[in-house]
Design a protein with these regions (language model features):
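Short, surface-exposed beta-strand-loop junctions and turns on beta-sheet-rich folds
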Residues: 18-21, 40-42, 100-101, 110
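Extracytoplasmic
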Residues: 8-10, 66, 80, 131
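A generic beta-sheet turn/junction motif
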Residues: 6-8, 17-19, 78, 87-89, ...
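N-terminal mature ectodomain segment of secretory-pathway/periplasmic proteins
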Residues: 1-38, 70
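Short, surface-exposed linear segments at secondary-structure transitions and domain or protein termini
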Residues: 9-13, 33, 52-55, 126-129, ...
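Flexible, processing/modification-adjacent segments and terminal tails
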Residues: 26-89, 109-114, 163
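Gly/Pro-enriched, hydrophobic low-complexity segments
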Residues: 80-162
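Generic beta-strand structural signal
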Residues: 6, 26-27, 76, 94, ...
Length: 163
């Protein structure tokens, strides 16, 4: 089970298995950290700023005022033409026909190795007039498929979720 809660400039992401928290990530105005198997990792400097900048309910809204973003062209993503937008170390792909975000590639470094993580967004469904991808496929060396079972908007979110 994965639970993601967001508010302006705040994000809480928790992954549970058999009722136990496996990993958790918190971002708020003051800090950002990740917990995994009881170990806490605090983010500082550029990592903290990047995480805080992305901690929005709808990250795409921040793109409207981002002077660093650039349209690099149209690319084919899984058979669909998509606008490619370069945003720092990430490239965002939006379907030319639907306007939906269909993929995101991020340049990352882990243990001294540079790699590209690509995430695909599929099966968009309507929730209270907004569209959300119900299928997310992450390629991080292995392919991980996530299926959304429920999206709630403006329900059950408190300040305590972001501490």
């Amino acid at each position: 089970e994965m639970v993601m809660k967001s508010a302006p400039k705040k994000l809480s992401f928790e992954m549970k298995a058999m009722g136990m928290t496996m990993s958790k990530q918190i971002v708020n105005e003051k800090e950002a950290y990740a917990m995994q198997q009881g170990q806490r990792k605090d983010f500082t400097g550029d990592e903290l700023k990047e995480m805080q900048a992305e901690a929005n309910t709808f990250k795409e809204l921040a793109l409207l005022t981002d002077k660093e973003i650039s349209l690099t062209g149209i690319e084919n993503i899984n058979g669909a033409d998509a606008y490619a937008l370069k945003n720092g170390k990430a490239t965002l792909y939006y379907d030319v026909k639907t306007g939906f975000k269909i993929a995101e590639s991020k340049e990352m470094e882990q243990r001294g190795q540079k790699m590209t993580q690509t995430t695909y967004f599929q099966d968009y469904k309507d929730v209270k007039g907004l569209k959300f991808p119900y299928k997310i496929i992450m390629n991080v060396g292995i392919e991980i498929e996530l299926t959304t079972t429920e999206v709630k908007i403006n329900e059950g979110v408190t300040d305590a979720d972001f501490k």
